[in-house]
């Protein structure tokens, strides 16, 4: 839980980790401490009803969040308001059903995609997982 947050902290970034569930944020803070990392700033965030006073960021990243249509639509509405004018979003997706819809909606909102495909070994699976990493920027 919160692996992208831990990697960003390890690389010295200032991080705001968000989730719908407080328990997920607790676990992210715990994992940071267990790995000798500073505690990240955290906030509850409901993609479907976000606080409109959210900060603007140079980088927004997410992993494996494109799993249902309503989430994809909410994220496509939310991400543009979170990004600074020259900011970028990085989304990692293991080929979820609604990934093409997210790409379409973001492109309709004036964003362009650069996508890299990578293969990841996952403990407990007898096959590798292909992950698409999308770098998303305004046109």
Give, region by region, the residue ranges found by the protein language model.
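S-adenosylmethionine-dependent methyltransferases
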Residues: 1-139
């Amino acid at each position: 839980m919160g692996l992208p947050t831990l990697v960003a902290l390890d690389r010295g970034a200032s991080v705001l980790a968000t989730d719908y569930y407080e328990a997920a944020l607790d676990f992210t803070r715990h994992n940071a401490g267990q790995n000798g990392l500073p505690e990240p700033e955290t906030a509850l965030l409901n993609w479907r009803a976000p606080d409109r006073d959210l900060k603007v960021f140079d980088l927004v990243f997410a992993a494996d969040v494109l799993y249902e249509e309503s989430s994809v639509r909410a994220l496509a509405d939310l991400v543009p308001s979170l990004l600074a004018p020259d900011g970028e979003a990085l989304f990692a997706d293991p080929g979820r059903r609604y990934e093409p819809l997210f790409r379409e909606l973001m492109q309709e909102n004036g964003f362009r995609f650069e996508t890299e495909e990578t293969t990841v070994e996952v403990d407990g699976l007898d096959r590798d997982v292909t992950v698409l990493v999308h770098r998303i920027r305004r046109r």
